[in-house]
Amino acid sequence: MADVPINAPQHCPGTGSTEAGKSSACQGCPNQSICASGTMSGPDPAIEEIKEKLSSVKHKILVLSGKGGVGKSTFSAHLAHGLAQDESKEVALLDVDICGPSIPKMMGLEGEQVHQSGSGWSPVYVEDNLAVMSVGFLLSSPDDAVIWRGPKKNGMIKQFLRDVDWGEVDYLIIDTPPGTSDEHLSVVQYLSVAGIDGAVIITTPQEVSLQDVRKEINFCHKVKLPIIGVVENMSGFICPKCKNESQIFPPTTGGAEKMCTDLNVSLLGKVPLDPNIGKSCDTGKSFFSEIPDSPATLSYRTIIQRIQDYCEKKKVTCFS
């Protein structure tokens, strides 16, 4: 996998590329002779550093989606809020959606900045037991576009995993970009040695979303990433007055439930549409504290409990 040193030029091909040290973009780079010699194409020393840095993190969960716009980052934010409601748990949320970092907005942290200490980057805290890190904190404006090639994104992800000082953490939730790209390969490669519990895959009921989720599931199998389960988001609308459910996005091919049965993957639950979810993301507040008794909140709580049960069961299996 190609990677980019921090002091590399903008169009660096990456240390693992066959063009490393030879490309026109390499002219004048302080690393040119080292890259050209091939000494940087060996095992990445950062892998052991990441393993050591994350040794204090008990559970690591990736949140994936095959398609954008299905509520992946929304789920990541609410998963973090839900887990952090237990004050005895330390929770961390890492946003590696490099080109579309929405977590700062959803967590009410826009305008916050990252500070460096002797032990690494200090995350930004929402609550005493909920820490957040995102590339959005490194931008001068939330409207700035991140126009990076894959190798530079990989370098940023490596730096997040290696340099952020999370401390003792029970759950690290990693919000990824949609699809299967360089970022996903980087995260899986770096976390494979640190121990990753698995992935939660977010979808909506429509076939156009499910077909991309099937690709995501195949990706997980190929890279040996365990699948915790699938969450069907925007699954119907429950009227707050009459309590009847309407299918806004009808599951024309059986929805996530049939897909999970066909592919032998766990369905963690279905989250109904609720306009208050979008409102809470826009205002950066926890949906659980704002609307504690809504059907969506109850669904989230069930899903979060199933994720916790999976992680605890896996921990027992690993040590037995």
Curated annotation (Swiss-Prot):
Assigned keywords, A-Z: 4Fe-4S, ATP-binding, Cytoplasm, Iron, Iron-sulfur, Metal-binding, Nucleotide-binding
Region called Disordered, residue ranges: 1-23
Amino-acid positions noted as binding [4Fe-4S] cluster 1 in the UniProt annotation, renumbered to this chain: 12, 26, 29, 35
Binding residue positions for ATP: 66-73
InterPro entries documented for this protein: Mrp-like_CS, Mrp/NBP35_ATP-bd, NUBP1/Nbp35, P-loop_NTPase, YlxH/NBP35
Cellular component terms per the entry's GO annotation: cytosol
Cofactor requirement: [4Fe-4S] cluster
Residues binding [4Fe-4S] cluster 2: 239, 242
Subcellular location: Cytoplasm
The organism's place on the tree of life at top rank: Eukaryota
Any one biological process term the GO annotation gives: iron-sulfur cluster assembly
Entry's Gene Ontology molecular function annotations: 4 iron, 4 sulfur cluster binding; ATP binding; ATP-dependent FeS chaperone activity; iron-sulfur cluster binding; metal ion binding
Cofactor note: Binds 4 [4Fe-4S] clusters per heterotetramer. Contains two stable clusters in the N-termini of nubp1 and two labile, bridging clusters between subunits of the nubp1-nubp2 heterotetramer.
Function as written in the Swiss-Prot or TrEMBL entry: Component of the cytosolic iron-sulfur (Fe/S) protein assembly (CIA) machinery. Required for maturation of extramitochondrial Fe-S proteins. The nubp1-nubp2 heterotetramer forms a Fe-S scaffold complex, mediating the de novo assembly of an Fe-S cluster and its transfer to target apoproteins.
Complexes and interactors: Heterotetramer of 2 nubp1 and 2 nubp2 chains.
Family the entry assigns: Belongs to the Mrp/NBP35 ATP-binding proteins family. NUBP1/NBP35 subfamily.
Xref: PANTHER family: CYTOSOLIC FE-S CLUSTER ASSEMBLY FACTOR NUBP1 (PTHR23264:SF35), NUCLEOTIDE-BINDING PROTEIN NBP35 YEAST -RELATED (PTHR23264)
Protein name: Cytosolic Fe-S cluster assembly factor nubp1
Gene name per UniProt: nubp1
